[in-house]
Structure formats: structure tokens, C-alpha cells
Amino acid sequence: MSEVIVEMSGRMAKSVEAFKNDLSRVRTGRASISILDDITVVAYGSTMPLNQVATLTIPESRMIALQPWDPQMIPPIEKAILKSGLGLNPVNDGKVVRLNIPQLTEDRRKDLVKQVKKIAEEFRVAIRNVRRDAIDTLKLQKKDKEISEDDLFKLQDDAQKETDIYIKQLDEVSASKEKEVMEV
């Protein structure tokens, strides 16, 4: 297989991994620490990720517990969670901040499915752009007489097959996440 196709395949695999990573931040009805990945807290004069100022655990299926290393960090942590837009209300007992994950409403679940579909489409476009870049490179190689016309058509076909494989992976991951979001 051509170096160009191998590189294209690697870039597509990275896109699928990035897609999975993005989807892990989409909230479902279950507690997941990854929904807090993007939250930053103002601590000691600088901005720090939430997981660097507290220990995050899941004591129950619908609860996340945050235990700050410094109890003075509880108010900034609560403030950061409220500002995050996740719709979570922190409850603190002076030592631990608890986040109860509420049951998602039907409307909220439908909105989240739309969000998943939108993210999936963005990554499909990214994968197709990678294919286009690879085909452009192959056409340049043909123009420079590095490959023959027959090789060009065969490699374009290989590029399309690889693209189809990664788009299918993306669709499977997307369908799985949509199903997870719609579970009551």
C-alpha cells in the first residue's frame, strides 16, 4: 500500500479517536467523570483543571463526588460547576462536593442526540477532507510521473475503501452513543 494511503489511514484513525473523546463529554443519564474534563477552577491565582484540585469519584451510578485537597477550594469548585452549563447543582458538606446527575428529560435526550449527530457529521467531513488531501497528493505524484495512471486509479480506490471503513466506524460509535443517550 502507498505511503500516502498509510498516512491517510493514520490520520483517519486519529479522527475516530478524537470523535470518541468528544463523545465521552456528552452527558448521559449516568455519572461519568469525563463530563467534567473541560471545567477549570480559579485556584491560587491561576486557572487549573478540576481534576488537579480535587479527587473525583463515582460512589453511585448517578453521583459524582469531588474531594478537594484544600477545603478552601470548595466555593471556587462550586462556582466553576455552576458556570459550566452542564445543568448540575453542587451540594457540599464542608469536605466533599457531591453532584447528583438528574434523570434526563425526553426533550433533553433528543437535544443530546442532535448534538451527537452534529459532532459525527463534523468528523465525517474531517475524514472526507483527509481523503481529498490524499487524492490530491496522489494526483501530484502522477503529474510528476512518480506513479502511473493505473496506479492512481487503484490508489484512489484504496483511499475510498479506507474512507468507507472509518466512516462506518464513526457511524457505529455514533449509533451506540445515541442509544446510550436515549436509554431511560
Swiss-Prot record:
It comes from Desulfotalea psychrophila (strain LSv54 / DSM 12343). It is found in: Cytoplasm. One of its GO terms (biological process) is translational termination. The keyword Protein biosynthesis applies. This is Ribosome-recycling factor. Disulfide bonds: none annotated. GO terms for cellular component: cytoplasm. Responsible for the release of ribosomes from messenger RNA at the termination of protein biosynthesis. May increase the efficiency of translation by recycling ribosomes from one round of translation to another. Belongs to the RRF family. Coiled coil: none annotated. Pfam families: RRF (PF01765). One of its GO terms (molecular function) is ribosomal large subunit binding.
